[in-house]
Amino acid sequence: MPDSQKISEKQSEYMNLIAEIMDIRKRGEKPVAYIRTYGCQQNVADSEKIKGMLEQSGFEFADEPDNADFILFNTCAVREHAEDRVFGNVGALKNLKRKHPQILIALCGCMMEQEHVANRIYKSFPFVGLVFGTHSLHHFPELMYNALLDGKRVFERGNDDNQLYEGFPVKRDGTFKGWLPIMYGCNNFCTYCVVPYVRGRERSREKNIIVSEAKNMIESGYKDITLLGQNVNSYGKGLSENVNFSQLLREVDSIDGDYWLRFMTSHPKDCSKELIDTIAAGTHISKHLHLPFQCGSNRVLKAMNRHYDRKKYLEIINYAKEKIDGLSLTSDIIVGFPGETYEDFKETLSLIREVEFTSLFTFIFSPRVGTPAAKMDDPIPAEEKSKWFRELLDVQEEIAAKRCSSMVGKTEKVLIESENDKSGELCGRTSGNIIVELEGSKDCIGTFQNVKITKARNWILKGELVK
């Protein structure tokens, strides 16, 4: 089997057929699509492919669903809260479908790869006409055409041939900040995580394709490019070419231009000294490492099936601190894993204090159907977990304030990303992914600016443009 395969010309034919159907229905007016994406950046990248295919089918895009001809929710299965939001928002479309029967409402993404979810959609949401999972993206036009053709519901999930498809048209959401997938799937099977079940096994894209896409993005003016994968440190496994993630990172970094290069997500068990050395020596690589540790207790890490311990994690963190000047460290933490005690939780707090992260993405454990952790005994009450969660936030807030305060008086290179609608202030990020707010012209958006840091407020910096 080749490393990758192009989506078929047949799908381009289906895009043309969709355009013909919509042209008849709309009597020459442009059809409108509304896409809402939940979850991770990998979902954002998938939605950009879907938008690319819809654009080739003649669609324009709306920010609200009210006047759309096609409505699609790209869903996330990582936490219960995201699933609840999807069900609530889909239910709210019932009246819209009643008023406009020709609207096609569709759901895709990770939730749709779960049998119990697909069954619930089929039984409880009869106005949803198209459902497909993460493994069906390469023939989305065919599925959509079939749903439009006779109005019959189309449901497809679990069609994983472990093949990786290339050649998608892509309509990116941003013009200066972009996502570049380098691999899909995960082989780690952490006991709490549903990703391997809904995204499949690891599949790496060919290096020359990734480098070519990165070069095109840089030449098109992209200033901040993030290489994406569920575990980027596993990149290259299974490819016919002998290549690893550090080698790929160095090759992309060698492309001329004024840009930052980021990546996510790294798994501590595969995070090597070679990768740290590559970041340290890089020209464009952001001095930011996101390395999820999830829990500071070895006992809990073993129950999570993380394949590293506290000592191994701290060894790679300390090596990174030693080698990379101005390193910004961020991480993910799960609070209240089944069987976790307050003594275990205190080990998490001590690790946070020892490392001094710039920021943390912290979540209370959310059981996922089909994972081993969902069947584990979980005696700690939700109220107790919430108490631990607040304690952790207090500790991290103090650390973040200290780290940000140390930057006051320094001048930082900042990518200006947006304008605050209420305050009129500009908002940007440093290479270390720290938010900076400042006064300035909207013309600065999408450009790098030198900013003197004048004030720190918890994890946000205030600054002023250096003329």
Whereabouts are the PLM-identified features?
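Proteins enriched for Cys/Gly/acidic motifs involved in redox and nucleic-acid/cofactor modification
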Residues: 1-235, 274, 289, 311-322, ...
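Short flexible coil/turn linkers enriched for glycine and charged/polar residues
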Residues: 173-176, 186-188, 285, 295, ...
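Conserved SAM/AdoMet-binding glycine-rich loop
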Residues: 102-107, 116, 219-342, 353
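Conserved, mostly hydrophobic/aromatic
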Residues: 190, 210, 227, 263, ...
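Radical SAM enzyme [4Fe-4S]-AdoMet core and its adjacent flexible, acidic
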Residues: 40, 236-257, 304-307, 367-398
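Short, solvent-exposed loop/turn segments at secondary-structure boundaries
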Residues: 82-84, 201-206, 236-242, 303-306, ...
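Terminal RNA-binding accessory module
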Residues: 2, 375-467
